[in-house]
């Protein structure tokens, strides 16, 4: 060993093994207990020494600030898998993702990157010392029962371009730990210069490592560093827990900068619910809308079912209606007749609450006491119809619903039938012939009610042609009979 330490190597010679060589040759033999030629890599308890004291313990002289050591894994817990990486002056903190080392298509080990911090978490100060830990793959240990992962191979690197206080200190106020089950990234075994290896840092700005041959390699910046192994997990989780976290507020302020979010959170008025103005009334400053309603609308709201105030003041039943004597006009007026003298609900009167009353007469009303349905009453009905057509949409909807219920039509038909039967019984002269004539005339009227003038002309022409044909046929028959009589005589 002393010979290697005292040996002066010529320029260009050095110890620059690849990652695959460190695991497959040196670390695997160390775990198997096999002898390594020259024993270039010493065994040192790295976690009990400060990083600046380790270069003196290396047996191979080097000028590239890279030193290799075997270290026994000091478990933080007796039955755990976490290593205790704390020293007297500071601690080694893991950063970046674990990367798989492959030889061909087979994974032979894992590479972990750590950075030394002075002090104690979470106020540790980042330093220029970097360590790469090489682990043998677990499947290699399972394949060989005599193998144990009791050793790791460590490579210590010191960065010469490190400037303390130039944005290199770790921001401990917002740690972003790396989960332990993160999938490792793969490092290819084919590297142009195995000595020029990337260095993973926590800072957003890339860092470079100066090599002796002038080759500089850009650092790979890690987005999610993992917590130090010697940090209490419960304390670290308590620091991450925010009892005032609001997911809706966080989503709403996702697009805002930190300064804008601080202003939003400090503004108490911005958190209060926004009160929208109600523009439902015509005037924004007036709450009551009764001043903007017509008298008809107010009455329709209080007393739904009618739109004519004059008819309410002077009900229609005060003016009994006399039927017309002719059949053609009497049918229409008969259907419109609806007296309202008896408003008591009964089994035969189911619509007493809607203003329609069914009334049965046992005696014939004298003609002298029945005024004609014309004049003032007819004018009032016309005014009511006009008001119904020009009233508010709400009144029109009520009228349409009332008519669509079907009760008015049914009542009108029953009333017309009752009146006709009452008139026949009161007269004491049942006239079947008159009823049949009325039915025949009503059928003819209904058949030709929808005919237009052109259809009437066609009907008249067809009737005239039929009449002429009948007359001609009759004359022909008479002439034929007269000729036969002459022949017989």
Swiss-Prot record:
This is NAC domain-containing protein 74. The chain crosses the membrane at residues 456-476. It is a single-pass membrane protein. Its main location: nucleus. Keywords: Activator, Cell membrane, DNA-binding, Membrane, Nucleus, Stress response, Transcription, Transcription regulation, Transmembrane, Transmembrane helix, Unfolded protein response. The NAC domain includes a DNA binding domain and a dimerization domain. It is found in: Nucleus; Cell membrane.
């Amino acid at each position: 060993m002393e010979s290697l330490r005292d040996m002066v190597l010529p320029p260009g010679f050095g110890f620059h093994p690849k990652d695959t060589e460190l695991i497959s040759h040196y670390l695997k033999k160390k775990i198997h207990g096999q002898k390594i030629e020259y024993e270039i890599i010493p065994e040192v308890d790295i976690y009990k020494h400060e990083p600046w004291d380790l270069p003196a313990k290396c047996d191979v002289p080097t000028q590239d600030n890279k030193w290799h050591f075997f270290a026994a894994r000091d478990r933080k817990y007796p039955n755990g898998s976490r290593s205790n990486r704390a020293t007297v002056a500071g601690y080694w903190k893991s950063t970046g993702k674990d990367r798989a080392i492959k030889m061909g298509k087979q994974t032979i080990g894992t590479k972990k990157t750590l950075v030394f911090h002075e002090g104690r978490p979470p106020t540790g100060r980042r330093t220029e010392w970097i360590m790469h830990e090489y682990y043998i793959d677990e499947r290699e240990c399972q394949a060989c029962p005599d193998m144990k992962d009791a050793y790791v191979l460590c490579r210590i690197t010191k960065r010469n371009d490190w400037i303390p206080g130039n944005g290199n200190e770790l921001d401990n106020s917002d740690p972003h730990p790396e989960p332990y089950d993160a999938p490792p990234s793969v490092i290819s075994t084919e590297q142009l210069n195995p000595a020029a290896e990337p260095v993973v840092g926590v800072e957003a700005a890339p860092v470079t490592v100066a090599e002796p041959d002038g080759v500089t390699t850009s650092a790979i910046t890690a987005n999610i560093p993992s917590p130090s192994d010697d940090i209490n997990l419960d304390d670290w989780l308590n620091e991450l827990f925010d009892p005032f976290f609001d997911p809706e507020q966080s989503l709403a302020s996702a697009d805002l900068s930190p300064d804008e979010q601080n202003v939003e959170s400090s503004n108490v008025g911005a958190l209060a619910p926004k009160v929208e103005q109600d523009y439902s009334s015509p005037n924004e400053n007036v709450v009551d809308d009764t001043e903007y309603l017509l008298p008809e609308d107010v009455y329709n709201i209080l007393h739904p079912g009618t739109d004519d105030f004059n008819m309410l003041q002077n009900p229609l039943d005060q003016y009994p209606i006399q039927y017309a004597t002719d059949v053609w006009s009497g049918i229409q007026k008969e259907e419109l007749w609806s007296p309202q003298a008896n408003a008591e609900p009964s089994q035969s009167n189911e619509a007493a609450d809607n203003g329609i009353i069914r009334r049965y007469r046992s005696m014939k009303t004298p003609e002298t006491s029945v005024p004609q349905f014309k004049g003032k009453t007819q004018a009032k009905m016309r005014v009511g119809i006009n008001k119904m057509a020009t009233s508010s949409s709400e009144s029109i909807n009520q009228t349409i619903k009332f008519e669509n219920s079907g009760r008015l039509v049914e009542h009108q038909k029953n009333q017309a039938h009752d009146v006709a039967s009452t008139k026949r019984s009161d007269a004491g002269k049942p006239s079947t012939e008159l009823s049949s004539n009325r039915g025949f005339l009503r059928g003819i009227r209904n058949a030709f009610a929808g005919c237009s003038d052109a259809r009437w002309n066609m009907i008249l022409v067809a009737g005239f042609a039929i009449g002429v044909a009948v007359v001609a046929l009759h004359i022909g028959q008479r002439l034929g009979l007269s000729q036969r009589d002459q022949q017989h005589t």
